[in-house]
């Protein structure tokens, strides 16, 4: 009986016998068909851009200006808002038209890419080497492969520079640290000091150091993109105009599956970094759009109760909690004045609504008694009830309100999805790296299944 999974099924003129791969192996059937593989890639790009455009318009259609973005489950509009589109002081949305334009532009682009994908999949030449040698390639051609790497690096560099140009010359970007609670700001003095920019890379990823995730000002972010954009473009030119050195020729496996494994490893790393960035960072991911970080929600709660009880007559400087430590304020391990209670674990949190109340030795008692502004109280109360925690009542000392039961923070969505996808991509990296290395070493592909128990079992029919 013929089934979808046996070798006799032919799809698109290609069967398992002629290609070595079944229909469900997807693009593996196109390994040596550069024209058809181009079609698959362009169509894939079209799907990605279509999702971006359609989801963008979906979020615009459902957007309620009176509610914060993070309360509406949005993940695309916060990115556009962070780029300075449609927002004003305090992150307030003042114009949704730029978001609509973004969605339409992506939809139009996806149509062009979709047409190109269909054309190259069905009509265009199966291979490019004969008709279009510049675009053709052989997987083992080391020089051609590094040329292609170079083109990719240049495009990535241009992408990084687009953010720089937007921030410096085309309207600026949203800066959560702008005085008074955040605003769109032109970055006139980006950090170009290599010691500062690359100092982030040399930091420990643990504890309060936080590697590149610890970046806490827009000047460093834009300056970092200047460096990354320039290095990517220069690296791209290098790889285009040079051939791989002997040590590189020997060190790497030069096959299609090897390149796939390298790409999966790189994307996996990016996924893990994006996970940490979206979860911990409130500069690149402003809390006005993505909601508070976990530590931020916890500190907000401590601040809110301090404000409330201070108004009711409590002496917040000396009141003791049930453990004998300070109920509202206490000392950090290094002597700074910090919030007391369970939020002590987040004592090194930094946020634009709290920093004005600090002095040279942590929180300033005089400022806490006399200088708290209404916008700080409002923001802390809002953040306190929108913690990015998967709990109906209490986690880590953060109490949520009944109205927050159905709230899931965009930080939770973004961090979880990027971690899970990053992990799967890492497994894919290991899988394809192992296959590529085995093939390069001349091993038998696949696993010997002669001893599988299923082979000795009675057929189902």
Curated annotation (Swiss-Prot):
One of its GO terms (biological process) is photosynthetic electron transport in photosystem II. SUPFAM superfamilies: Photosystem II antenna protein-like. It is a multi-pass membrane protein. It holds the Pfam family PSII. Keywords: Acetylation, Chlorophyll, Chloroplast, Chromophore, Manganese, Membrane, Metal-binding, Phosphoprotein, Photosynthesis, Photosystem II, Plastid, Thylakoid, Transmembrane, Transmembrane helix. It comes from Tetradesmus obliquus (Green alga). Binds multiple chlorophylls and provides some of the ligands for the Ca-4Mn-5O cluster of the oxygen-evolving complex. It may also provide a ligand for a Cl- that is required for oxygen evolution. PSII binds additional chlorophylls, carotenoids and specific lipids. The chain crosses the membrane at residues 57-81, 122-143, 166-188, 243-263, 279-300, 435-459. Belongs to the PsbB/PsbC family. PsbC subfamily. Residues 1-2 form a propeptide. The gene is psbC. GO terms for molecular function: chlorophyll binding; electron transporter, transferring electrons within the cyclic electron transport pathway of photosynthesis activity; metal ion binding. The modification N-acetylthreonine is found at residue 3. The modification Phosphothreonine is found at residue 3. GO terms for cellular component: chloroplast thylakoid membrane; photosystem II. The keyword Manganese applies. It is found in: Plastid, Chloroplast thylakoid membrane. It comes from the Eukaryota. This is Photosystem II CP43 reaction center protein. InterPro entries: PS_antenna-like (IPR000932), PS_II_antenna-like_sf (IPR036001), PSII_PsbC (IPR005869), PSII_PsbC_sf (IPR044900). One of the components of the core complex of photosystem II (PSII). It binds chlorophyll and helps catalyze the primary light-induced photochemical processes of PSII. PSII is a light-driven water:plastoquinone oxidoreductase, using light energy to abstract electrons from H(2)O, generating O(2) and a proton gradient subsequently used for ATP formation. [CaMn4O5] cluster binds at residue 355. PSII is composed of 1 copy each of membrane proteins PsbA, PsbB, PsbC, PsbD, PsbE, PsbF, PsbH, PsbI, PsbJ, PsbK, PsbL, PsbM, PsbT, PsbX, PsbY, PsbZ, Psb30/Ycf12, at least 3 peripheral proteins of the oxygen-evolving complex and a large number of cofactors. It forms dimeric complexes.
């Amino acid at each position: 009986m013929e089934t979808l999974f046996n070798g006799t099924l032919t799809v698109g003129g290609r069967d398992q016998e002629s290609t070595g791969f079944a229909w469900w192996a997807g693009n593996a059937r196109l390994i040596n068909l550069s024209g058809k593989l181009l079609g698959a890639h362009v169509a894939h790009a079209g799907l990605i851009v279509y999702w971006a455009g359609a989801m963008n318009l979906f979020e615009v259609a459902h957007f309620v200006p009176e509610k914060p973005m993070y309360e509406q489950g949005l993940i695309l509009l916060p990115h556009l808002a962070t780029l300075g589109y449609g927002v004003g002081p305090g992150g307030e949305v003042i114009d949704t038209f730029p978001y609509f334009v973004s969605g339409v532009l992506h939809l139009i682009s996806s149509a062009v890419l979709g047409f190109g994908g269909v054309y190259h999949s069905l009509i265009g030449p199966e291979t490019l080497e004969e008709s279009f040698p510049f675009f053709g390639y052989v997987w083992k051609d080391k020089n051609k492969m590094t040329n292609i790497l170079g083109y990719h690096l240049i495009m990535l560099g241009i992408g990084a520079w687009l953010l720089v140009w937007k921030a410096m010359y085309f309207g600026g970007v949203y800066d959560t640290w702008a005085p008074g609670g955040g605003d769109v700001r032109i970055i006139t003095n980006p950090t170009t000091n290599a010691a500062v920019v690359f100092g982030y890379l040399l930091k420990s990823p643990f504890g309060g150091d936080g590697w590149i995730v610890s970046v806490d000002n827009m000047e460093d972010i834009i300056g970092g993109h200047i460096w990354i954009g320039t290095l990517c473009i220069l690296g791209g030119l290098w790889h285009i105009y040079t051939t791989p050195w002997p040590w590189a020729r020997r060190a790497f496996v030069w096959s299609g599956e090897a390149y796939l494994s390298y790409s999966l490893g790189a994307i996996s790393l990016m996924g893990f970094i994006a996970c940490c960035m979206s979860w911990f960072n409130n500069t690149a991911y402003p809390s006005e759009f993505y909601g508070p970080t976990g530590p931020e929600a916890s500190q907000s709660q401590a601040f809110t109760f301090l404000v409330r009880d201070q108004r009711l007559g409590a002496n917040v400087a000396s009141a003791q909690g049930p453990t004998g430590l300070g109920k509202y304020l206490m000392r950090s391990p290094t002597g700074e004045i910090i919030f007391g209670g369970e939020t002590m674990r987040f004592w090194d949190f930094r946020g634009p609504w709290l920093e004005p109340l600090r002095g040279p030795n942590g929180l300033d008692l005089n400022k806490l008694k006399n200088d708290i502004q209404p916008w700080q109280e409002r923001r802390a109360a809002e953040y306190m009830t929108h913690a990015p925690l998967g709990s109906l009542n209490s986690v880590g000392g953060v109490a949520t309100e009944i109205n927050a039961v159905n709230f899931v923070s965009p930080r939770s969505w973004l961090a979880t999805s990027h971690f899970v996808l990053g992990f799967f991509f890492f497994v894919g990296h290991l899988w394809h790296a192992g296959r590529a290395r085995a093939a390069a070493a001349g091993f038998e592909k696949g696993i010997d299944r002669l001893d599988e128990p299923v082979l000795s079992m009675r057929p189902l029919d």
